[in-house]
Amino acid sequence: MTIGDLGEFGVIGRIAGRLPQGAAVLLGPGDDAAILSAPDGRVVVSTDLLIEGRHFRRNWSSGYDIGRKAAAQNLSDIAAMGADPTAIFVGLGLPADVTTDWLDALTDGFRDECALVGASVAGGDISGSDTVVLGVTALGDLGGRQPVTRAGARPGHVVAIAGRLGHAAAGLALLQAGRADGGDLVDAHRRPRPLYACGPGAARLGATAMLDVSDGLLQDLGHIAEASGTGIELDPAALPVAPALAEAARDLGADPLEWVLTGGEDHAFAAAFPGDVRLPSPWLVVGRVIEGKGVHVTGRSGTAGGWDHFR
């Protein structure tokens, strides 16, 4: 059966029936708008757009993978502000020939990723489309904490990361080479695994600037450097290159460090902390904030690279 057979309201009912609501949702799907509690009095909001052929391919990723990925990249933005995600809203553009099984898998992917952080899919919209288009808006609560923006890094602070780097880029390279059997690396492209708790955890540790690495470490740290009016120096010897990453690079004739520095969509967290802070695992110090501008990698030349939607 296809969603065209169900019709718009049949599709909406099918989606809503698979989505339990958490405590933050006072009124969920079914009315003109949802109502959420806001204990902190401030609401953190982020939105992202995913377009078939640009951000995912249905012949590479299942509906479930795509739902998990779309939720993850929005939930990680909320966590990167030091907030706890509470809900997401999903706008769907779908071709009429999409099967109900695929739709169920997509819905379950959204639901299961949200469940990792205690969030809910609290509403959304649906429309016909020539290709699959997903618009996701995520909300979060600061729990009385100050938000961690990109603008607080100062010379003398350390730069640390929490999460994997380069894995999604390596997985994409393997898929492009026809290596869909690329194991954990391909899975990292299909379904990133942000360490959500590290976002609010960093805020409690005193992080002065933070973001999630969606467009590549160099490019994203460049945003912190620009917003903070500082430079950042990275130590390449401190950057983690997993054995699987090194092996894939050998097979494809690539530089694994290039994946680590410029690969996007791992949604690791990168943050600046005062130099005297003792950071627990999984935080790993990889550089320092310096006077100046831009991001510099010791022993390497060139400009920061990464993902740009218009290049």
Pin down the residues of each PLM region.
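Glycine-/charge-enriched secondary-structure boundary and capping motifs
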Residues: 1-20, 61, 95-120, 127-134, ...
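Small-aliphatic-rich amphipathic alpha-helix that forms the alpha element of a beta-alpha
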Residues: 63-87, 108-116, 200, 218-224
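Active-site glycine-rich loop that binds ribose-phosphate moieties when present
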Residues: 137-148, 155, 183-203
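Residue-level signal for inorganic ion chemistry
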Residues: 35, 74, 82, 121, ...
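Glycine-rich anion-binding loops of enzyme active sites
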Residues: 37-40, 50, 84-173, 288
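Extreme N-terminal cap/leader segments of soluble proteins
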Residues: 1-62, 81, 90, 109-113, ...
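Short, compositionally biased
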Residues: 169-186
